[in-house]
Structure formats: C-alpha cells, structure tokens
UniProtKB/Swiss-Prot annotation:
This is Alanine--tRNA ligase. One of its GO terms (molecular function) is ATP binding. Keywords: Aminoacyl-tRNA synthetase, ATP-binding, Cytoplasm, Ligase, Metal-binding, Nucleotide-binding, Protein biosynthesis, RNA-binding, tRNA-binding, Zinc. It catalyses: tRNA(Ala) + L-alanine + ATP = L-alanyl-tRNA(Ala) + AMP + diphosphate. The gene is alaS. It comes from Staphylococcus aureus (strain MSSA476).
Length: 876
C-alpha cells in the first residue's frame, strides 16, 4: 500500500471520481445554510439533502466531495480513544438516480487496490453485507472475486433512520495484522467487531427502499448511492500509524504542544489524552470560527465555548497555565491550507477570538477551581455527591462549565447531583424566556427603552464611518454596564452611520470596535424615542458603556443598497408612466442583492409592458441624472410635485429625493449621488401577491450583469445545440423543429393506430351480443394514454351502434374508456360503466352518459374488470 499524505489521499479520491464522471461539490461551511434541522454540518451527505430529496437537481447525477464536518454527541470520548473526533473530513461519492451497487462496489475496489490510486493489498480487505443482500454478495464474490470467507454477513448492515429512504450497506475493512490483535470471535476480533485490527475504511449505502409510515418498505423509483470514507482514518491506515492522531493531520499540532508544554507525546497515556483533546478541539474551533460561529452561551456558540474550555482544562494537566490555544491556529491553517484556505485567510481574527476566550476562562478557572476543591472536600466528608445547587452556582455565577465539574468530580471519585442542577437550569430558562417575551426582541416599547432619552444622531447620509461613543447597553431586556464576548447585545451610539430598517430598506450591517472589543452589527431598528438601536454579537473582548468606538458600515452592501433604492424610485415612476396613474406602491424591500416592489395593478403585465418599464428605467440610468436630496416643509415638497407614498405619515419637514424630471419622491432612505452609479437595471420576475397587487423583483449593477451573462451563456449553449451560427437564426430553427415535431407526432399517432388495428384484427368479429346490446369489451395494446382515446375514435367510426369499453396498461398504469351510442344512453350510461370498473383496478373515473374515462394502479386486475363489466351489462 502507498504511504500518502492526507492531502494526497483527498486529492486522489476527488481525481478518481472525476475520471468516473463525477462533479466535485465544494466543501460547504460548517454552519448550515437554510437548514434549521442541523446545528452543524455533520456528514458528507448533509449538504446534499437538497439533491436527494428533490428540491434541486444537480448539474450531474454523479457527485464527489470532501466535506468538513462536526459531531459533538460524544465529546467526552474524544482524547480517550484512537479515532473519536469532533471535527473530521468525510470523503464521499454519490449517485442521484444514476449508477447503483455494481458500479459503486467496482469503483470502491478499484480506488483501494489499484496501484494508480491507494494501492492496498487485496488480501487485506474484508467486507460486510446485509444477510439478505444477495446482489451485493454476488458482486463482491463473483465479479470482484473476493473469497466467501472475507464476506461477513451482519444484520446491522442496513441504513435506516425512520420514515424516508433506506437500504442495505456494505462496509470495507482493512486488516492491520496480528500486531493489533489475534483472531478471536469471543473478543469481536473480526471485521465489523469492536477491535483495533480490522478498521472500517469505507461505507457504501445502497438507498433503494422507502421506509413507509406503516413501517413497510417499498422500492424507490430512483435508487441512490451514498458513501463515506473518513479521511483521518484512511490516513492512519495509509501512513501505518496506530491512531488517527499520529497522522500528518495531527502531528504538527502535537509537535507544537510538545514545545509549549515541555512534555512528549506517546510517552505517558494520561498526558496523551490531553494532547489528543487539544489537537482535536483546536481544529474544530478554528474551522467553526472561520465559518462564522462564535463562542456563546447557547446553541453552536456554546459548543465552541465548551470545547475551548475543555481543551484549556486538559492543557493544565500538561503544565500549561496561560493562553496558548490561539498559537495553534497557524499550525492548523498550514496543515489544511491546500484545500481549505479559509482558516489562513481569517487566522488573525480566529486567534483574537480564541485568545480573548482563553483569557476569560483562565480567570474563571482559577476562581472556579478553588470553589470546586472546597465542594469536593465537603462531598467526600458527607454524601460523596456534589450538591446540584452548588454546581449550578458555580456554573451561573462563575461561568464554570458543568461538564468540567462532572469530569473533575469523576476524577475525584464523586458524582454530581444533576437532577437538582437541571431543575435550577430550567428555572433559569423560564426566567430568560419571560424576559424575552417581555422585550419581544427589543421591538416593543419596553420600559427600559422608553426611559432612554439621550440623543443618537444618524450621520449615515454623508458617511459610512464615525468615531463615536457607546452610550447604552441592553442585555436580556435590562440595561447593563458591560457585556462579554459571544453575547447578543443591543446598544446605542451618540452618532451612528448605521441606517435603521425603514421604508422597505434593510438596515446597514458592519462593525463597532476599539482595541478591546468588536461587535458585529446585524440589525438596526428605531427605539421608542427615535434613536437608532443596534443589535450585534460581541466577537471578542468585554464591551463597556462609555467606550469610544469606531463604527463602520459594510460599504459594499451599502453601495448595493443605494443602487437598489434609487432604482426602486425609477421603477415606481416608470410603472406609472407605462401602466397609468392608478399604480401605487403597496410595499417594497430594498436589500443589497436585489429589490422587490409591490404595486397596485389590475392584472399581469404583458411582456411588452415589462420591456417598456425596464427600458425607461435604464434610459434614466444612462442619462446620468444627479440625485438631489433636500429637506423642506411638506407644502413645498408637494408644490414641486414630489410623490408621497400612499398610507405613509409624514412630519412637517420631509426629505425629498429628486431625480427630476422623471422621479421626485419623499424618502428617508439612502441613495446614489447620480443615476449612472446604478449601472444597469434588470427585471427578473413579475407576479401576483394578492387581489389587485403585483410584484416585481429586479437586480441592478453587477448582479444584473451576472444575471444577463448567465442568460447569454444558456443562449449560446442552445445556439450550439441547435447548430446555428447567428442569434437571428435561433427562433427560425426552433419554429422549424416544432413544426417537424408536430408532423412526426402526427405520423406516429397514425402508425400507432395502424399497429393497434393490426394487433386487434377484425374488430367486428370481437363484438358480442349481451342482454340485447352489441358490446365490444377488450384490452388494447397502446403506447400511451392518449393513444387509447384515438383508438376509441377509430373503433367508434366502424362500430357506430355498439357499446365499446377499452382498457390498456401503459407503464403499469391502467387507462380505460367507454362509449355508449346516444340512442342507448337511457338504458346504459358510459359514466356508470367506468365507475363500476375502475375500483377493481385500484382507481376511479366517470363522465357523461355517452363518453367516460378512468384509470387505476393495478394492471393485474384488468381482465377481472373486463369480465365484471360484461356481467354487469348482462344484468341490466
């Protein structure tokens, strides 16, 4: 087997499957996007759910990825085992309704055993399968040539998480040899057992059944492949080391810990635990912060804080009693940089966050350990259990993690009264929930906000930055003097460049900072007394009231918002010009990436009207009109023709945004200085949102250009596929193809009729007399449901005085049609005939007395239904 670096294994895996026609799906951020069901991305397939559940169609049905992931369900095991991790990489190849077991197994075997790829010795590989999966067994045994003795049947080889896709799986194991254990079934020394000799290196899941609500299983219409190979584990096998922690993914970190601690790795088992905890946790923390997570007291932020504090606690067993974890970030960045440059790019920020957390926790730890040692003495002298209220006080007052209290208690031979602790925690949650309800996300006029009357001046019309003072901090519905890192806080500034959400325009985002702390601003709203109320998360440090700070708006977003807001005014004026003065704004949303405008109008706009509006807006952009903004009294504004928005309330002094002569409108938002800054305007959709209200969504500037570029790319592809040279030929070619298709379909229908007629022979000979009626009841072989109706038309023209009932099986679905001559409909009704027949084939139907149709899902009962209907007519 080749000895490969982890980065080489990753690249070989991706290259191999690209050669097999797979599309590389880039590793997604650890913080899930648009998936509230996950705290973290926890597997290779987690980011592909949109493809497997059909929400999106991938560009290719074959996908390969190397996905970073976090799992924290067994944190306490990390450090004590050879392969437990909170952060890991999962290599995976996936098929969305394309290849299945045969190719999946063949691909796996080739990648593992080929000298071009991993070069593993075939005689060291074993596999497990589900006992009933004979298809997988035959592929492994007959096609791959694996001896029967190396194929182990295990009942647990079935991937099933409840309702939804499920199926058997096959796992591939590598035999590391007798140095890791002698064969002994009693000790689970076999592939699939708990041992260190036979390591699972790859899991192939064959998703072929749907687990139904009634716990039955039915075959999936599209079978999928989902595989997973842990990079850390494969690296340990390739590099022939005992544990994942001895691979090149971890050893540079271990070497740095050795330098800082003066201790050696792989000398003392107890020390090794600390080495492994630190090395694992710093990878998780660095990557999570680089992907947008921050230490906090709840959610994923609490996971980070817990991991960091656990690592700091174990670092003390190595004699490290000062912040040092942040120094490992550069090591992690260097190891992972080839595939994950994000950590190196954000290394300075990551280090600042970690160092700030470490400093806080060292203070907490010193105070907390002194108190905990007293509690341990007390418990040993009495019940051998640390009181739950004491543990909660340690957690609540001193920030000492309960997990750490438990861990230290166990080391001292004690337990913690967790029942009482949880009771105290629940009471705290109830208090916090009540506080949240009272404050309603600070958007209601709480007593705290109503009592704040100090001024906060908005200066953002003229600047995106300001040197200012932080005057008020609100945390958990109460005004406070300081707030710690990781917490969500509301605050006010004496002067602020941040625009508060208003008039459909979203709030600015950005940062407020000084040398001691930084707040990432995510929302800005108006407080009851008119001040701009900022919401943000403390990135690092301790925030104090009275601090002098720099306030910086995200200028890229600000510029895009300005473009979209000014374009919204032009759009409003253009709609009035094209559609009429009845158009009034019914709502709007101005964001950085798009604009949305709701307006009153009677019905859908025509394509020509949309084109006219778009052209008008762009012409005003290309004219380069100066945008003049003035404050004046409402009377003067109306006199100059300023448009006031329907339903809006205005004060005595108003702000007029003037793009004369095309648009003059009252507005408090932020705008470009000249319409040419907008660059380009493109309407991307027009739709209805309710009675008399239409909605336009549009893009400006670069976003509009990229949208048009994408359309042009698709058009060029279509032109290439149509094999035409000029743009003008595309429509003519499409028209030609449509005409040809119609002609071919007509020919095909005629051919189908002729084939059906030949198969049926002389239909007059098949007519029976039943109960005095001429009746033709038969199954016909037709290519589609439409063909059964044309066959019926053909038969009717030949058998005008006959009751005709036809049934067909097309793609395991039953179609049936019945006709009754109008002269007979007083006695026999076609609708009744179909209603009687359809349930027999698991369906329903009906229609007029002279013509009816139906369908069903049980083609095996067609003959039964035809016999039944003959008896039914006989008994009329």
């Amino acid at each position: 087997m080749k000895k490969l670096k982890a980065s080489e294994i990753r690249q070989k895996y991706l290259d191999f499957f690209v050669e097999k026609g797979h599309m590389v799906e880039p590793s997604a951020p650890l913080v899930p996007i648009d998936d509230d069901t996950l705290l973290w991305i926890n597997s290779g397939v987690a980011t592909l759910k949109k493809y497997f559940d059909g929400r999106e169609t991938p560009k290719k049905p074959r996908i390969v990825n190397s996905q970073k992931a976090i799992r924290t369900n067994d944190i306490e095991n990390v450090g004590f085992t050879a392969r437990h991790h909170t952060f890991f990489e999962m290599l995976g190849n996936f098929s969305i309704g394309d290849y299945f077991k045969q190719e999946a197994i063949e691909f796996a075997w080739e990648f593992l055993t080929s000298d071009k790829w991993m070069g593993m010795e075939p005689d060291k590989l074993y596999v497990t399968i589900h006992p009933e999966d004979m298809e997988a067994y035959n592929i492994w045994h007959k096609d791959i040539g694996l001896e029967e003795s190396r194929i182990i049947r295990i009942e647990g080889n079935f991937w099933d998480i409840g309702e939804g896709p499920s199926g058997p799986n096959t796992e591939i194991f590598y035999d590391r040899g007798e140095a890791y254990g002698q064969d002994d079934p009693a000790e689970e020394m076999y592939p699939g057992g708990e041992n260190e000799r036979y390591l699972e290196v790859w899991n192939l899941v064959f998703s072929e059944f749907n687990h139904n609500k009634d716990h039955s299983y039915t075959p999936l219409p599209n079978k999928n492949i989902d595989t997973g190979m842990g990079l850390e584990r494969m690296a340990s096998v390739s590099q022939n080391v005992r544990t994942n922690y001895e691979t090149d993914l971890f050893m540079p970190i271990m070497n740095e810990i050795e330098k800082v601690s003066g201790k050696q790795y792989l000398v003392n088992n107890e020390q090794d635990v600390a080495f492994k905890v630190i090395a694992d946790h710093i990878r998780t923390i660095a990557f999570a912060i680089s992907d947008g997570a921050l230490p906090a007291n709840e959610g994923r932020g609490y996971v980070l804080r817990r991991l960091l504090r656990r690592a700091v606690r174990f670092s003390q067993t190595l004699g490290i009693n000062e912040p040092f974890m942040y120094k490992l970030v550069d090591i992690v960045a260097d190891i992972m940089e080839p595939y994950y440059p994000n950590v190196k790019e954000k290394a300075d920020f990551i280090k600042r966050v970690i160092k700030s957390e470490e400093e806080r926790f060292h203070e907490t730890l010193e105070d907390g350990l002194a108190i905990l040692n007293e509690l341990i003495k007390k418990a040993k002298a009495t019940t051998n259990e640390i009181n739950g209220k004491d543990a909660f006080k340690l957690y609540d007052t001193y920030g000492f993690p309960i997990e750490l209290t438990e861990e230290i208690a166990v080391q001292a031979g004690l337990k913690v009264d967790m029942t009482t602790f949880e009771s105290e925690m629940q009471q705290q949650r109830d208090r916090a929930r009540q506080a949240r309800q009272n404050s309603q996300s600070m958007q209601v006029q709480s007593e705290v906000l109503k009592n704040i009357t100090s001024a906060s001046t908005f200066v953002g019309y003229d600047t995106a930055t300001a040197q200012t003072t932080l005057t008020h901090l609100i945390y958990n519905g109460e005004e406070v003097s300081q707030v710690e890192a990781g917490e969500t806080v509301y605050f006010m500034l004496t002067e602020t460049p941040f625009y508060a959400v208003s008039g459909g325009q979203v709030a600015d985002t950005g940062i407020v900072y000084n040398d001691n702390f930084e707040i990432a601003v995510s929302e800005v709203t108006k407080a009851p007394n008119g001040q701009n109320l900022h919401k943000g998360v403390v990135q690092f440090g301790q925030v104090n009231v009275g601090a002098t700070v720099s306030a910086e708006v995200n200028q890229n977003d600000r510029r895009d918002i300005q473009k979209n807001h000014s374009a919204t005014h032009l759009l409003h004026a253009a709609l009035k010009s094209v559609l009429g003065d009845h158009v009034n704004q019914a709502g709007s949303l101005v964001e950085a990436d798009r604009l949305r405008f709701d307006f009153s109008h009677f019905g859908p706009m025509t394509n020509d009207e949309i084109d006219q509006v778009e052209r008008l807006v762009n012409e005003e952009i290309w004219k380069g009109i100066d945008v003049n903004i003035q404050e004046m009294d409402i009377a003067s504004a109306k006199e100059m023709g300023a448009m006031a928005l329907f339903g809006e309330k205005y004060g005595d002094v108003v702000r007029v945004v003037n793009m004369a002569p095309f648009s003059i409108e009252l507005c408090g938002g932020i705008h470009v200085r000249n319409t040419s800054e907008i660059g380009l305007f493109k309407i991307v959709s027009e739709s209805g949102t309710g009675a008399g209200v239409r909605r336009i969504e549009a893009l400006t500037g670069k976003a509009a250009f990229l949208y048009l570029e994408d359309i042009q790319e698709k058009f060029n592809t279509m032109k290439s596929q149509l094999k035409v040279k000029s743009d003008d030929q595309v429509v003519d070619k499409l028209t030609q193809l449509q005409d040809e298709e119609k002609a071919l379909l007509k020919q095909l229908e005629q051919r189908d009729k002729e084939i059906t007629s030949l198969k049926m022979g002389n239909i007059e000979n098949q007519v029976e007399e039943i109960n005095g009626y001429k009746v033709l009841v038969t199954e016909v072989d037709v290519p589609n449901a439409k063909a059964i109706r044309s066959t019926m038309d053909d038969f009717k023209s030949k058998l005008q005085d006959t009751i005709i009932i036809l049934a067909s099986n097309v793609d395991d679905k039953v179609s049936m049609v019945a006709t009754v001559p109008k002269s007979l409909t007083n006695n026999v009704k076609a609708g009744d005939l179909i209603k009687q027949m359809a349930p027999i084939v698991g369906g329903k139907g009906g229609g007029r007395p002279d013509m009816a149709q139906g369908g069903g899902t049980q083609p095996e009962n067609i003959s039964k239904s035809l016999s039944f209907i003959k008896d039914y007519i006989k008994n009329l």
